[in-house]
From Swiss-Prot:
One term of GO molecular function: NADH dehydrogenase (ubiquinone) activity
Protein topology in the membrane: Multi-pass membrane protein
NAD among keywords: yes
Lineage of the organism: Eukaryota, Viridiplantae, Streptophyta, Embryophyta, Tracheophyta
Gene name, Swiss-Prot/TrEMBL: ndhG
Catalytic activity annotation: a plastoquinone + NADH + (n+1) H(+)(in) = a plastoquinol + NAD(+) + n H(+)(out); a plastoquinone + NADPH + (n+1) H(+)(in) = a plastoquinol + NADP(+) + n H(+)(out)
E.C. number: 7.1.1.-
Function: NDH shuttles electrons from NAD(P)H:plastoquinone, via FMN and iron-sulfur (Fe-S) centers, to quinones in the photosynthetic chain and possibly in a chloroplast respiratory chain. The immediate electron acceptor for the enzyme in this species is believed to be plastoquinone. Couples the redox reaction to proton translocation, and thus conserves the redox energy in a proton gradient.
GO cellular component terms attached to this protein's record: chloroplast thylakoid membrane; plastid
This protein's name: NAD(P)H-quinone oxidoreductase subunit 6, chloroplastic
Similarity remark: Belongs to the complex I subunit 6 family.
Organism, as annotated: Oryza sativa subsp. japonica
Principal localisation: plastid
Keywords, comma-separated and alphabetical: Chloroplast, Membrane, NAD, NADP, Plastid, Plastoquinone, Quinone, Thylakoid, Translocase, Transmembrane, Transmembrane helix, Transport
Sequence intervals crossing the membrane: 10-30, 33-53, 60-80, 92-112, 152-172
Subunit structure: NDH is composed of at least 16 different subunits, 5 of which are encoded in the nucleus.
Length: 176
């Protein structure tokens, strides 16, 4: 999106703030239905960031796949869970919660130290997509494939990992 600087910064700050609030809602809300709706809010904010980065195809895929399918699947699985099970548990902090919190705090900090030191040149091992498009011998579907294999390789792979984790989580919740 070609927005003036201050408007772009305001949208990024607003999206980040709502993303953090939604993430806290996913983790801290005791009602699983509200937690699932908070997850939907987080996924919508992530698609807003993709729109701000001019990555419209990934934003639409994010909305359709995650908000439209995965989040609905999670809410569907949560609706099958008996509500009285969640209200009986009054133990708010356990050792497992402490371990989970430690892991959730350590992973972002390790990523923040690892990502800047990584050479990302190897990811773009193919020719650039604009060089291929200049040939004019390909149609729109091939252009989308080329963009996914070059420009959007890293976001596409991250989205596929998130999709896999969401699917495993939904299956686990449905089994319980």
């Amino acid at each position: 999106m070609d927005l003036p600087g201050p408007i772009h910064e305001i949208l990024v700050l607003f999206g980040g703030f709502v993303l953090l609030l939604g993430g806290l809602g996913v983790v801290l809300l005791t009602n699983p239905t509200f937690s699932a709706f908070s997850l939907g809010l987080v996924l919508v904010c992530i698609s807003l960031f993709y729109i701000l980065l001019n990555s419209y195809f990934v934003a639409v895929a994010q909305l359709l796949i995650y908000v439209g399918a995965i989040n609905v699947l999670i809410i569907f699985a949560v609706m099958f869970v008996n509500g009285s099970e969640w209200s009986k548990d009054k133990n708010f902090w356990t050792i497992g919660d402490g371990f989970t919190s430690l892991v959730c705090i350590t992973i972002p900090f390790s990523l923040m130290t690892t990502i800047p030191d990584t050479s990302w040149y190897g990811i773009l091992w193919t020719t650039r997509s604009n060089q291929i498009v200049e040939q004019g011998l390909i149609n729109n579907v091939q252009q989308i494939g080329i963009h996914l294999a070059t420009d959007f390789y890293l976001p596409f792979e991250l989205i596929s990992i998130i999709l896999l984790v969401s699917l495993i989580g939904a299956i686990t919740m449905a089994r319980q």
